[in-house]
């Protein structure tokens, strides 16, 4: 191995993680910040990284508001009942009111959607899910991130967040290393979006048999990523 070097990168917005959340955040950051320098850092490769790397057969939440199938209030009620009241209803409502427009955007980007031959509506499996041919799900969203970011850094494992020395309790960047070369990377940013992974297996499910249904969650989805 050659001499290890240190690479510095300054930006306006740093996105840590290149899964669905990170690539989506990169796209949204560009939409709202046309003139900003945006950098996304991923430990694998954004084309096939994160929980959707292998693709999905369904999108697990779609209101269908244009056809009056469900409304955000319905989803809040469902989540409240499922979690026995332990829910941030404001956040659930905010997610629900935006999810349809996001699905429509994926449709426009070329995600193959299954449709009812008679009505033309998205084909459902149950009350909330809609069916897709989702092998290309992640590459489609990754392509949007590539077009949005000034730089995409693949194979960089972020190990620590950097605190802003001038503002208390404010993150000002991150450090990590290249998993192939060993080079160190120091990212300094005006804002940092942490999208480094979700969390599962942190509590016992309440439904009988639900444990078996959740065994497909991988060990990495454990909430350890700078939550």
Residue ranges and their predicted role:
Residues 205-226:
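A conserved FAD-binding loop/helix module that cradles the flavin
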Residues 17, 195-196:
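Short, well-ordered coil/turn residues at beta-beta hairpins
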Residues 13-40:
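N-terminal Rossmann-like FAD-binding beta1-loop-alpha1 element of flavoenzymes
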Residues 22-25, 196, 201-204:
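Short glycine/serine/threonine-rich phosphate/pyrophosphate-binding segments
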Residues 2-18:
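N-terminal/domain-start segments enriched in small and hydrophobic, helix-friendly residues
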Residues 8-11, 181-191:
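Core beta-strand elements of the Rossmann-like FAD/NAD(P) dinucleotide-binding domain
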Residues 4-5, 36-37, 42-172, 178, ...:
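Conserved N-terminal/central alpha/beta ligand/cofactor-binding core
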């Amino acid at each position: 191995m050659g001499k290890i070097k240190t690479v510095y990168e300054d930006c306006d917005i740093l996105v840590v993680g290149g899964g669905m959340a990170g690539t989506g955040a990169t796209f949204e950051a560009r939409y709202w910040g046309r003139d900003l320098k945006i950098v996304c850092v991923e430990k694998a490769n954004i084309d096939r990284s994160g929980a959707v790397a292998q693709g999905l057969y369904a999108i697990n939440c779609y209101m269908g508001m244009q056809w009056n199938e469900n409304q955000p209030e319905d989803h809040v009620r469902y989540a409240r009942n499922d979690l026995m009241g332990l829910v941030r209803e404001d956040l659930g409502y905010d997610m629900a009111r935006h999810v349809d427009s996001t699905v429509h955007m994926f449709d426009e980007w070329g995600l193959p959607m299954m449709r009812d031959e008679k009505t033309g509506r998205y084909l459902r499996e149950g009350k909330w899910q809609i069916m897709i041919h989702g092998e290309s799900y992640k590459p489609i969203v990754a392509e949007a991130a590539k077009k949005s970011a000034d730089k995409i850094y693949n194979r960089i494992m972020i190990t620590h967040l950097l605190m802003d020395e001038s503002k208390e309790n404010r993150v000002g960047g991150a450090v990590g290393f290249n998993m192939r070369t060993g080079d160190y990377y120091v990212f300094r940013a005006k804002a940092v979006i942490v999208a480094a992974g979700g969390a599962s297996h942190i509590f016992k499910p309440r439904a009988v048999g639900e444990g078996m249904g959740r065994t497909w969650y991988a060990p990495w989805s454990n909430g350890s990523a700078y939550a």
